[in-house]
């Protein structure tokens, strides 16, 4: 956001007490750290050494900053996440102020593909959520007593759970060729269950969760879905808090696939088929994305890791960056800008704003930590993607 003049509340109060009329230009306060309507987004490169907010508040840097293209240890990337959670929350505090001790928390991760299913199913760095970030997020939640039940959920278009297929591996049990130090989701849940017996940890395939048929809250956008009704997993409908956790990734149909587009994974394959072609019959992907997002807009969103994916999906980008905040559209706006995209040309951003889920104007987003320009690393755009006509915010 552009630097704005921040009024000293004490001075204003003193002037009011003295009976002085406040100048009109001072009445037109735009955005301050004390106004929650301005979304805050934490931006943390692995090289982050500290910064200063627009109101003069200091933000301490990472204890062990590293180059943005260096392979990171688990401890280093987890420190990045903790910093992003700290500075990307609300005025009242970070993620720990959003989630209550007795909440049912769903972490919607992104595991579209699965390493080890066959000779063609290899892990492409950046194509799935970094498991070390998931691990660090759960450790944060458990350590701050945020959540009584924590569910890691995904509904992949490509793989099914082992118990429903003949495959020896699935997205929950894959160790991704050692990319995350031998970590798998199954191991992760087992370890946390042993350490925190008072919390229920679980894995859930949204493709086979119980569903309800529900109209889209507000107006449905998908033009081939005149009734505006979707099958919605009960887990998504009934959980108290939902965190969308996705890599920085391009997509041939939507330009980028970040925390809002992560909601394509909630459309159950048991109802829409594999690879969920039934969803795409209901309308354009951007429309379906925002329809699905409407059922339970993310309470918090986290993007990035060590790797992302550019172009049409096969080319990895090494860029150590984590972006986090309580408004998913604001987080995606910063993420898209960091990838070299114009947020005004992403159609599902436009649609999400139209439905009241926030805005995509960088000038109206309080970025904390690294500046967006400093975090920018242009990603190659998908060959067939057509930017939407840019609209004014």
Annotate each language-model stretch with its function:
Residues 3-393:
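N-terminal and secondary-structure boundary signal
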